[in-house]
Design a protein with these regions (language model features):
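Short, conserved active-site entrance elements at the starts or edges of catalytic domains
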Residues: 172-194
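Zymogen propeptides
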Residues: 29-141, 146, 155-157, 306
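Bacterial N-terminal signal peptides
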Residues: 14-27
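Broad, structure-driven detector of short, well-ordered beta-strand segments within folded domains
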Residues: 146-152, 207
Length: 313
């Protein structure tokens, strides 16, 4: 669909204060932010910017210490192909983030790890470490050793993992997803630059941890000219630092980038970039791994108003 207008209620104060702290954050010249609290311990922000290019960003801020909060990474598919000779032993079965939160009865979800496409199959292997509920789903690739992890006692962390730690009870690896690049380390932007992947502006999904232990789940839409045009890794990192990140990791992006919510009816709240059969953007992608948040409903919740587009009229 052609997106010609975005109508939002303005709530600029907090966002501009953050921009003053971290120069170069996209949206410094024109930004609008909406905030809601759909669940106990979960705050949801939608930020619409026009500089240096149009962006629509969704940020979920999760307090792992809040009552009722728990997490889940996509588990193994149980090797549905069996142990016959030549069996590819694929690790997970792809599904959209919306399908994942619906089937698992989670309240919020984002896409997770990079994965391989297998022709004529929804079964897939994932790139580097995936752990679900303490069970190793995908082995560690030392070239992608930075992971996002939820410990057994619900602490969020971003850490570098060694092969000897995987499968060890003392490692505290419980629900873990490997990413591609470390974006923020100890509050400093460390995102790489120089390659096409680093500096281009696709949709992005990222995760971060704040100094007080909160979890930041971020999506920025892209590949939709004039509506939302994506971010470089450096821009994502600066945005997350502006929101208090001390450590941050890049996850799978592009057409995989999705955030879904069940408030209470499951729905996708961002704008995926893959094309529908009619050629327009908005088709959710089935991915190898998703990350889900379980939480208690907030009785005082007021949903964010929908983003209006030309197709809404």
């Amino acid at each position: 669909m052609t997106r010609k207008e975005v109508k939002v209620q303005l709530n600029l104060t907090r966002f501009f204060m953050l921009l003053l702290l971290v120069p170069g954050v996209p949206g410094a010249a024109a930004a609008a932010m909406q905030t809601s609290e759909p669940f106990v311990g979960v705050q949801l922000e939608r930020i619409v910017t026009s500089e240096p290019r149009p962006e629509i960003i969704h940020l979920a801020i999760v307090d792992p210490k809040a009552a009722g909060i728990r997490f889940l990474v996509t588990p193994s598919n149980g090797d549905p192909n069996g142990a016959q000779p030549g069996d590819p032993n694929l690790e997970t079965t792809r599904e959209t983030t919306l399908q994942f939160i619906t089937r698992r009865h989670a309240r919020l979800g984002i896409n997770g790890s990079f994965f391989t496409f297998v022709k004529h199959s929804l079964d897939t292997n994932n790139v580097s470490l995936v752990i679900s509920d303490g069970h190793v789903v995908s082995p560690l690739d030392p070239r992608r050793a930075w992971v996002f992890n939820i410990t057994p006692d619900n602490h969020a962390q971003i850490r570098k993992v060694t092969a000897s730690e995987v499968g060890e009870p003392d490692s505290q690896l419980h629900d873990a997803i490997a990413g591609s690049d470390l974006l923020v380390k100890r509050g400093k932007v460390v995102a790489p630059t120089g390659s096409k992947f680093d500096d281009s502006h696709p949709p992005r999904t990222a995760v971060a941890v704040t100094r007080d232990g909160r979890l930041l789940l971020m999506t920025v839409d892209g590949r939709q000219s004039g509506f939302s045009e994506g971010m470089s890794l450096q821009e994502v990192a600066r945005f997350l630092v502006a929101h208090g990140a001390v450590d941050a990791l890049n996850l799978d992006g592009g057409g995989s980038t999705t955030m879904a919510i069940a408030d209470p009816h499951p729905r996708i709240i961002n704008f995926p970039s893959d094309h529908k059969p009619d050629g327009e953007a908005g088709e959710p992608r089935a991915v190898g791994v998703n990350f889900g948040v379980f939480a208690r409903p907030n009785p005082d919740y007021q949903p964010l108003p929908p983003i209006r587009t030309a197709a809404s009229h």
